[in-house]
Amino acid sequence: MSFIRLYHAKILTMEEDAEVFDGEVHIDGNRISYVGENNPELNKRKFTREIDCEGNLLMPGFKNAHTHSAMTFLRSYADDLPLQNWLNDRVFPMEAKLQKGDIEILSKVAVLEYLTSGITSNFDMYVDNYQHAKASVQMGFRTVFCGELNNFTGSLARTREEYETLNKGDELVSFRLGVHAEYTTSRELLEGMAELAHEYKQPVYLHLAETKKEVEECKMRYGMSPVQFLDSIGLFDYGGGGFHGVWMDETDRNICREKKVSIVTNPSSNAKLASGIADLPALKKAGIN
């Protein structure tokens, strides 16, 4: 088993006071066993590797809370389009051409990019979690998978299988309940997901209030915003999370606070698709995570 010493580092632990101090970090196998100042007694052990971090800042890895990792192959493929046209006219047709094994390879490309940016784990949603799981385990990268149940791919049975399988496998991977979005998922499937959430007593995650069009069409279908509709069917009874959260009113924000629905903002994506900007001051004022 490896035993690594990182020394002569400026260390930022991300505690509330944000103190930076000179010290070292020991990694015993896959666990951080020591963070602190130089301790001669601890350094008597034989390390398998010692790394001089002089001139560098050592801090916890970043977490990317919303990714579609295998979509690396679509970067710059379609620009200057609104979300629906971008998805339906360009992205979905290209994804339909993916062959067996492609997602594993493309996920590895994404993981390499994450690591060069200091990202050590991600929360990923895509069409084949098993291929990405294989890639993450092979590369020693931590991934939490989010289900993407919708009218076109996946099923409630598959969601149940992924929940049972990926949460009992390698410790680097795990799975959370999720649907792609309200606008891609029938009421029947959404209600089925709410039942799963109640069965497992688990939160549910999805793309939420990303565009003005999404909110307007949901109001036409159900007479409510996406947040209000999903809450009405019990989807958020055990909490959850919404990716984007751009087009939310005060009622939506109050529901998210009360039901412990976190909002993951995606400013670069929203800028690319001109979807809008999440109202961070309002979210913070409402007490939303």
Predicted regions and their residues:
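Alpha-helical scaffold segments that flank or form the walls of functional sites
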Residues: 75-140, 160-169
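Divalent metal-coordination and catalytic microenvironments
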Residues: 9, 25, 30, 55, ...
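N-terminal metal-binding scaffold of metallo-dependent hydrolase/deaminase domains
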Residues: 1-44
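Metal-coordinating catalytic core of metallo-dependent amide/deamination hydrolases
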Residues: 131-246
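A structural motif
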Residues: 119, 141, 201, 260-261, ...
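Active-site-adjacent C-terminal substructures of enzyme catalytic domains
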Residues: 235-289
